[in-house]
From Swiss-Prot:
Main localization, broad class: cytoplasm
Family stated for the protein in its record: Belongs to the class I-like SAM-binding methyltransferase superfamily. rRNA adenine N(6)-methyltransferase family. RsmA subfamily.
Organismal lineage: Bacteria, Pseudomonadati, Pseudomonadota, Alphaproteobacteria, Rickettsiales
Functional summary from the UniProt entry: Specifically dimethylates two adjacent adenosines (A1518 and A1519) in the loop of a conserved hairpin near the 3'-end of 16S rRNA in the 30S particle. May play a critical role in biogenesis of 30S subunits.
Protein name as catalogued: Ribosomal RNA small subunit methyltransferase A
Coiled coil stretches, renumbered: none
Reactions catalysed, as given in the entry: adenosine(1518)/adenosine(1519) in 16S rRNA + 4 S-adenosyl-L-methionine = N(6)-dimethyladenosine(1518)/N(6)-dimethyladenosine(1519) in 16S rRNA + 4 S-adenosyl-L-homocysteine + 4 H(+)
Gene, per the UniProt record: rsmA
Binding, S-adenosyl-L-methionine: 11, 13, 38, 60, 85, 105
Subcellular location: Cytoplasm
Top-level taxon of origin: Bacteria
Organism from which the protein derives: Neorickettsia sennetsu (strain ATCC VR-367 / Miyayama)
Length: 262
């Protein structure tokens, strides 16, 4: 049995019922193009292939799993895998114009980076069923006025409908992680609020790095003066004495557009 690489965040699932539960969270797999990150020995890959997808492409960084994945590829003509760094791979380099469903037990040490990268390729994404550390999943789904609500919540919710599916205890994995895990379903939104992305990112960075301060203080460097800031806040239905965690994604989006024109 191969030794697991902690540096790569390797925690695999071998229980078929759990694997099926993950796949069932997707709207549909049969006839769809599927993308998987962190294939390992191919347990999730094999379970997906039994659902008859149009194609499945897996990425695995650890070349020690090449033999197992090559064996799987020999059994299924609609399966391919690549050994490489998922952070460096764009969907458009693996799929042509097809809409892609991403199903993955993500390596927790790069999960957020992967998700934010896919936020820039959503025109090619049908939906995503992803495993996260529970703490990260809670941040993604968090609502305004909650302690977990932050920049990640806003960036994801402006692009996708985020739905928590179920939690998995550490003992489901081999080796078991020290944290509970959560599977999320993320569906790209068809109608999105216009926003100035660079300004929005600056608002989120400034605001949430000083989340306990009133907006009139935390966002003071975004606008030319306090009058402009107060006017912008009034236009989005916010008060200068509010904290940024009280503003919903729509308000923050609109604020970025007003700041752009200021």
């Amino acid at each position: 049995m191969q030794r697991y690489n902690k540096l790569l965040g390797q925690h695999f699932i071998y229980d078929r019922e759990v694997l099926d539960k993950i796949i069932d969270a997707a709207t549909s797999v049969k006839g769809k193009h599927i993308f998987e990150i962190g294939a390992g020995s191919g347990t999730l890959s094999a379970a997906i292939l039994l659902r008859e997808p149009a194609s499945l492409i897996s990425v695995e960084k650890d070349k020690r799993f090449s033999e197992s994945l090559s064996s799987l590829m020999a059994q299924y003509q609609n399966y391919k895998y690549t050994i490489g760094d998922a952070l460096l791979i764009r969907l458009s380099s693996l799929f042509k114009q097809e809409k892609v469903t991403i199903i993955a037990n993500l390596p927790y040490n790069i999960a957020t980076h992967l998700l934010l990268g896919w936020m820039n390729e959503l025109e090619q994404v049908r939906e995503m069923v992803l495993m996260f550390q529970k703490e990260v999943a809670d941040r993604i789904c968090a609502q305004p006025k909650s302690k977990n609500y932050g920049a990640l919540s806003v960036l994801v919710q402006l692009e996708c409908k985020a739905e928590s599916q179920f939690a998995l205890a550490p003992e489901v994995f081999t080796p078991p992680p020290r944290v509970t895990s959560t599977v999320l379903k993320l569906t790209p939104l068809k109608n999105k609020w216009p926003r100035n992305k660079p300004v929005l990112e600056k608002i989120l960075t400034e605001g949430f790095s000083q989340r306990r301060k009133m907006i009139k203080k935390s966002l003071s460097r975004i606008f030319k003066d306090s009058e402009a800031l107060h006017s912008a806040l009034a236009q989005v239905g916010a008060s200068p004495t509010m904290r940024i965690e009280e503003l919903n994604p729509e308000q923050l989006c609109r604020l970025s557009c007003i700041a752009e024109m200021d």
